[in-house]
Amino acid sequence: MSDSKLADSLNCLSVSTPSTTANPGRQQLLRLAVSNQRQVNNVSLANGKENKRTSNSKFNSSLRKIEEPIAGVPSSAGPQWREFHIGMFEIGKPLGKGKFGRVYLAKEKKTGFIVALKTLHKSELVQSKIEKQVRREIEIQSNLRHKNILRLYGHFHDEKRIYLILEFAGRGELYQHLRRAKRFSEEVASKYIFQMANALSYLHKKHVIHRDIKPENILLGIDGEIKLSDFGWSVHAPSNRRTTLCGTLDYLPPEMVEGKEHTEKVDLWSLGVLTYEFLVGAPPFEDMSGHSATYKRIAKVDLKIPSFVPPDARDLISRLLQHNPEKRMSLEQVMRHPWIVKYKDSWTRKSSESS
C-alpha cells in the first residue's frame, strides 16, 4: 500500500468507523477533567516549567470537543467532523520510542488539556506492511471506554505522519517499575492482576482479543492504576477462531506456538504469564539458549514455580497456564480467587484514601 492509499484509508476511517458509544455524561466528563487537571499540576513540558492550573469548565469544554469525533455525533448542520492538526498542540518531552515513531507529552494549546501524542511515520508503516495493523489499532481502541484501558481521544495525519491522541498515563510504563522493583509484592501484584482481569473481561464482552499482553504494553495512571495499551495486535473476533501468529514470544500460549486456532483464551494464558513475572521477576518459559527452546517449554507447559511464591498465587498461575484453553480459569474466577480477595481490602482502602 502506498502512502497515498494509506492516507485514503485513514480518511475513510475517520468517517466510516465512528464509535457507537454515547458521549459520557457531565459527571463523567467532570471526573476526567479533574483527573487530567491533577496530571497538569504534576507534569512539565520541555521547558521544565510547571503548567498553570486550568479551570474545570475549560477541561469540560476540551473533553466535549474531543468526544465528538470519537462518538460519531454529528452537529445539527450535518456530519461535520472536528479536524485535529499538529498546530493545536504544544509538544513536550518524549515519553517513549518505538520502531515506527515516538510518543510525546503534549498540551492542547487553547485548553491546556494534557495528552500523549503518538507519532507514526507513514513510509515506515508501508515499508513494513503493517498499515492494516495500525488501522485496526485505531478502530478498536477508539471504541473502548474502561478505567483500566488507555483512552484514544482521536487521530489525524499529515503528509508524512499519523498522530494518535492518547490519554496521558502519569506514572509511565509498568515495565520500568517492574525492572526497578525486580519483582512486585503480593499486594501490588494482586491489585494489578485484578485490574487486568477486569479490563480483559470488558474487552472479551466486546469480542476483542488483545493478543499482546506484557509489561511493556501496560502503563500506570496518575493514581497507580493499570492502563492497558498497544492494541496493534488486537482483533475483533465475534465468532471466528484465528490462526495468526502474533504477540511476544515469552507470552505466546501453546495453541499459537503450535499453529492451531485460537480464541480469546489466549489472553488468559498471557495473564498467567504476567502473574508469574510480577511475582518472580522473569517470564516462566524464558530459555536463554534461544527461541526454539522457549517454544518447546511453552508447548510442554514446562512450568517451574519458585518456592517463595505462596501456594494461593501458585494455584492461580497453574490454573491459568493450562495447555488446554478450555481448562483455563475464567476472568470472573480470577477476580474472585482467594489470592486476589486476600489483598483486595488493603489496596481498595489505600486507593480510596489517596483519591
UniProtKB/Swiss-Prot annotation:
Keyword terms: ATP-binding, Cytoplasm, Cytoskeleton, Kinase, Nucleotide-binding, Nucleus, Serine/threonine-protein kinase, Transferase
EC number: 2.7.11.1
PROSITE patterns to which the protein is assigned, alphabetical: PROTEIN_KINASE_ATP, PROTEIN_KINASE_DOM, PROTEIN_KINASE_ST
Catalytic activity: L-seryl-[protein] + ATP = O-phospho-L-seryl-[protein] + ADP + H(+); L-threonyl-[protein] + ATP = O-phospho-L-threonyl-[protein] + ADP + H(+)
Membrane-crossing residue ranges in chain numbering: none
A cellular-component GO term for this protein: meiotic spindle
Family annotation (Gene3D superfamilies): Transferase(Phosphotransferase) domain 1 (1.10.510.10)
Pfam families in UniProt: Pkinase
GO molecular function annotation: ATP binding; histone H3S10 kinase activity; protein serine kinase activity; protein serine/threonine kinase activity
Effect of substituting residue 118 to R: No phosphorylation of bir1; inhibits cytokinesis in a dominant negative manner
Residues at the catalytic site: 212 (proton acceptor)
Binding locations of ATP: 95-103, 118
Domain Protein kinase: 89-340
GO biological process per UniProt: attachment of meiotic spindle microtubules to kinetochore; interphase mitotic telomere clustering; meiotic spindle assembly checkpoint signaling; mitotic sister chromatid biorientation; mitotic sister chromatid segregation; mitotic spindle assembly checkpoint signaling; mitotic spindle organization; positive regulation of G2/M transition of mitotic cell cycle
InterPro entries reported in the protein's UniProt record: Aur-like, Kinase-like_dom_sf, Prot_kinase_dom, Protein_kinase_ATP_BS, Ser/Thr_kinase_AS
Subcellular location: Nucleus; Cytoplasm, Cytoskeleton, Spindle
Entry's family note: Belongs to the protein kinase superfamily. Ser/Thr protein kinase family. Aurora subfamily.
Description of how the protein assembles with itself and partners: Component of the CPC complex at least composed of ark1, bir1 and pic1. Interacts with the mitotic checkpoint complex (MCC) subunit mad3.
Free-text function comment from the UniProt entry: Component of the chromosomal passenger complex (CPC), a complex that acts as a key regulator of chromosome segregation and cytokinesis. Has a role in error-correction of aberrent kinetochore-microtubule attachments to ensure that sister kinetochores become bioriented and connect to opposite poles by promoting spindle assembly checkpoint signaling. Ark1 is also required for phosphorylation of histone H3 that accompanies chromosome condensation and condensin recruitment to mitotic chromatin.
Protein name per Swiss-Prot or TrEMBL: Aurora kinase
Organism: Schizosaccharomyces pombe (strain 972 / ATCC 24843) (Fission yeast)
